[in-house]
Amino acid sequence: MSREIRSLESIISDARENTHEKMLIRKQRDMTTDIAPERDLQGRFCSLRRIGEGTYGVVFKAIHVRDNVKCALKMIRTDRDEEGIPSTCLREISCIKDLQHDNIVTLFDIIYANSKLYMVFEFIDRDLKNLLEMLEPTNSVLPPNYVKSFMWQLLSALSYCHLRRIVHRDLKPQNILVSDSGVIKIADFGLARNFSFPSRNYTHEVVTLWYRPPEILLGSQRYSTSLDMWSLGCIFSEIASNKPLFPGECEISQLFKIFEIVGTPNIKSWPGVDSFPHYKAVFPQWPVNLKKLEETSCLTGNGLDVLREILRYPPERRLTAKGALSHRYFLQNGFTQNRPSVTDLMKDIRAQNRTPPLLNNHQEKSIF
């Protein structure tokens, strides 16, 4: 074992001591032999361009020299004096390294060099949020065949993950990549984790606010795959209407926006809801408002039925990813799994907008 790998193992073993991380750390120790030792990164990658930055590092677009393949380099800062490798990075590697699915972003390599961890992913030109933003100037929405294709691919990826007992916990348009050929890829597994049966307590600090399910907002720490399904329901509505379904400004605002459409829950509609830490008997009482759901989501017929079956409480009554794939929504009108071209769609959008393509104009910058 090389010095670099031993060093990484030392960081991992010293970085996390609390109970919730121990299983993840053990898995990561087993994985250190898969992490490449320090190499001449400058000789392996070229045409580097910074395309994003997060709490723990920076993402660069690059080209792998030998294979002439575009890739995304996620550079993770490590600090031996503080936390070392962030837990989100450990979780992402642990969850995604063995996932092989057409609709999940591929992790090509893991490189530890110069006290930094590099995760090398396949590169996709845009995310779903970028695509939806291009439609805004003309108040347009995605054509129905795109909506259905995107939803099918997302459900396929989630069904695959959930079968392997992995819950993503942070589904949102920014974490869904869209290729020119119309292929959808779920990315950013930084909050993902393996779940257990029966369910156990987990942190409730998951999922971006607009896509957070009501049980989490009410303080529940017990959840499983139904959490992802609620988020996907919100995304389904958003890609059909090009506007967020529940755009709350804070947690209580988010709850009330949900209640205004799905109805205020009670012990009859949701047995046990009164036991959640943040549940209040004095919540405003809203009835189920299917008309508002239809108007907001722009979905009708079988599409609206899928959305209704997903946005249900209690969570165990929600449609599963596997179940949704068998819904008549995907069986009507001769639906096929052929992916509509996003390149053609963007040409039409730009023609209407008369604007140049969305490009990231950051200058090339060395990361070494």
Swiss-Prot record:
Catalytic reaction annotation: L-seryl-[protein] + ATP = O-phospho-L-seryl-[protein] + ADP + H(+); L-threonyl-[protein] + ATP = O-phospho-L-threonyl-[protein] + ADP + H(+)
Disruption phenotype: RNAi-mediated knockdown causes arrest at various developmental stages. The few animals reaching adulthood are sterile and have a protruding vulva. Gonads have an abnormal mitotic zone characterized by an enlargement of the distal germ cell nuclei, a reduction in the number of mitotic germ cells, a reduction in the mitotic region length and abnormal expression of gld-1. Embryos have persistent ruffling throughout the cortex and mislocalization of par-2, which remains cytoplasmic, and par-6, which remains distributed throughout the cortex.
Keyword field: ATP-binding, Cell cycle, Cell division, Developmental protein, Kinase, Magnesium, Meiosis, Metal-binding, Mitosis, Nucleotide-binding, Serine/threonine-protein kinase, Transferase
Entry's EC annotation: 2.7.11.22
Single GO molecular function: protein serine kinase activity
Keyword Disulfide bond: no
Ranges of residues in domain Protein kinase: 45-330
Annotated function: Serine/threonine-protein kinase which, in association with cye-1, regulates proliferation, quiescent state and cell fate during the development of several cell lineages. In the embryo, initiates the establishment of cell polarity through the recruitment of the centrosomal proteins spd-2 and spd-5 during prophase. Phosphorylation and inhibition of the translational repressor gld-1 by the cdk-2/cye-1 complex regulates the pool of germline stem cells and the size of the mitotic zone in the gonads by preventing entry into meiosis.
Protein name stated in the entry: Cyclin-dependent kinase 2
Taxonomic source organism: Caenorhabditis elegans
The organism's taxonomic lineage, starting at the top: Eukaryota, Metazoa, Ecdysozoa, Nematoda, Chromadorea
